[in-house]
Every structure is written in C-alpha cells, then in structure tokens.
C-alpha cells in the first residue's frame, strides 16, 4: 500500500488501494479491465508518489467540435502535447468513439478511437488502448490511456488520462452522438431528441400509443388558392397509421395520400373554390368560410377504422365570394379566348356600396333617388398572375341593345369621363378586378330604364402597359371602335319611386340611400357629351 497524503485523504480514512496495470491491450478487442482505482497518484519512487487526487475533480476541459468523427476536414492537427487528465465537452461529443474511425476525420490524418468499452460509475480508473487508423489498419498506432466514469451536476461523464500520441498527425476523436442533446427546435411531447443522420433532430417516439382522435388537431395554411391541412405524423402513428395514409374529402373523388412535411408533419390540400371537393362555402357578412372534412384511412378498402378531421378557413369577404354566396346576384359573364393562353371567364356585377361585397340581387335593380351605383368586374378563371382585366369602354344605354346609338360613356378609351364628377374609377388594368362607381341617372324622354355595357380587354402584363395613362388629349379622342363580342351587358336599372317605398324587387338588403334624382335629361346631348 502506498502512503496517502493526509491533506488529500483525511475524509476518506486512507482507504486507497492501488492496483497497477499489468496487461497491455493490443488491437481493438480488449475486454473490460476494472482496476478499482478511484484516485490518481504520482508514480512510485517519484517526489509526487504520495500526492493523490480524484481526476473527476482535477482535469482539463477540451471543448473542440472539430474532434467530431463527422468532421471530414483534413488537417495536420496532432495531440502529441496532450498529457494528463482531460474531459471532452461541447457539440463535437463528450466521449471517445468505441469503433474504428475512417482516416482524415476529426481534423487530422490518423484519427484515434477507444478500443474497448467505457467504464461505468463504480469501476474506478480503468486502462484502455487508444488506436489510430492508418494504412488500412484500425490500430496502426496505439497509446495507453486511462478512463474514469464521473458523476456531476449535469449527469455522468468520463475523463481520460492521455499520454500524447506515438506519432503525428494523430488526434483523439469524439463521438458526436454523445454530445448534449441539442435539437434546433423544442420537441413536442410525442417526439424525442436523437442524434440521426449526423445531427440532432426530433423524431417520433416509438412507444407512443394514442387513443383519443380529438388530439389530432390540424394545422391549417389558408392560402389564396388552396387550403393545406397538416397533421401530426407522430400522433397518426400512435393511432395506428403507417407511412401510406389514404385521404378523402367530402367529395370522395378528391382522394390521395398525405405528403411529408418538415418536423414530422404530413399534409394534404383542398382548393379554395365553392363546391370543389365538397367544399361548403358560407358567408357571415364579413367573412367567407370554407368548410370540409378530411377522412383518413389505412387502405382504399375501409372496414372498421376511419378518422374524420373537420376543418375550415375564413377569408375576408371579397367580390368573387360575395357573388358565389348570393342567392340571385345580378351578374353578366363572358368567356374570352386568348390565343395561346387559354380561355378566361369575366364576370360583371352591380354592388350596393364601396366594399363591393354586397351585390344587388333579383331580376332588376330598383334604386333610391341619386344613389351611387358600384360596378365590379373580375377574372374568375384563367392566369390572373399574367393577365390583368382592363375595361376599355363602359357606357349606358336606354335599351338593352349594346349597339344603341344613344350612349353615355362612363369609361371611354380606357379613361373615365372627366366631365362627370360623380365617376370614380377605383381599379382598372392593375389586377384581375376592375371597379368603378357613378351616380345613377335616367335618360330624358320616354325612357324608364338604364342598361350598362362594358367592353373588356385582357392585358398581358409581361408585354404590355396595362394601367391606363389618361392625358387630356386622350380624353377628347374620337368615338371608340367597340368590339361587341367582348362586351358585358347588365341591367335593367330603374328609378325607385319615392311614393313606393315598399318595392323590394332587386333592392339592396341594406337600405338607407335616399338622395335626389336629377330632374333634367337630354338623351341626344348625353349621347355625344363625351
């Protein structure tokens, strides 16, 4: 027994027993060698022979991620200077690898690994061989090391007594799978953080068992053209679903499989179109709400296991949705064929206010006196990202004949009639929608009705200037040549008599526009005024 220094071992009652190693481990198949040494003491016969210490408390920390076996950067780094007790920490790993490491890893030429298993708590200091891989020999060089398992505040760790390296460039490696768990995002309760494919990531727990389908709450991405429904892949696995999940919407013809998404989610999509795939569209006055049900099955043949997930997306009410949800909107539609670009559908409707979300309904529009009429048109089929809707000419006639010689132009040659201060063109030639408003009127003479007609043009924004530039000279241009095959017609619009306030056919649902009608009209003058 070696004498113990009183300053070091008073509390331990000098119960130290040293068993010096007598076995040299060759190759990389050595068995566990437990020496039951807890403290490291100076070499016998040296001046420090009586000085002993616990390497768990006295060591040098090495925090160097480049030691990771996943580091393939070649370098001449060498550990010939490392002598003493060391602890590996950091993202590169906290333990030496226990299997052969490929050459040119760990930021060196010949990487060193631990031949044998690591000790566990209570084993004390054990002897191992560190091997360096080179020249197709996993233990071309070797060096004796000592290892001890320690217990700290953060858990178990290991310390290593290194004796430099037999040659350069050799370096001690670390196993990145032993690095502290460091997933970039917090794992959900149904996940666990593991080292996989050379990085830390959240994966589904293998022991997950889910019985409550209510926990399967979808994440929704309410896009402009489609609704993406995302479900937790881990929870689906806990319910018994495998990789291939068959999906159905309300319309059983809309079926497919879930697609993988990042972070253990799977998804499917539904179009944002009324009635498509069984979509149910509701209008609550301020929002358009699309509802559907996603059904999940494990196979195309269903016997006893089907999960239904209800979902809905709410959108701000717009012109298109308001027309889809109106019972009997007053609209006019036209199919326009653009060579090489397909067929487009243009729709025009009359609206009650500047929100363009409350269309007039019925067979005709019966207006209060001096009401402002709001006219909206939109492309609802075709490539709206490329083509913009442009109203080239909009005019009123006292008859339903779009070629009536009596015309009052509201928009002429793409520009508003600036002699009529009530005309306001809010949008034209800049998107898939066009909007304008005008204070309504009646033609003088024996005319009780007003009809609106608009010539439309689909402007290719990639080759044309679509937004009108309205100069004074252009406003005074000659009579436009109108392509009657591209004209939308809407009407009739008639004056609502003050003496007949109960008339409801075609009136807006929200009344309260009681102004004064113009009292002087001259049809011929109006026809040539602009």
Curated annotation (Swiss-Prot):
Keyword Ion transport belongs to the record: no
Span list, region Internal hydrophobic patch (IHP): 339-350
One GO-annotated biological process of the protein: establishment of localization in cell
Domain of life of the native organism: Eukaryota
Gene3D superfamilies attached to this UniProt entry: Zona pellucida, ZP-C domain, Zona pellucida, ZP-N domain
Quaternary structure and partners: Interacts with SYCN. Interacts with bacterial adhesin fimH.
Name assigned to this protein: Pancreatic secretory granule membrane major glycoprotein GP2
Native source species: Rattus norvegicus (Rat)
Protein's gene: Gp2
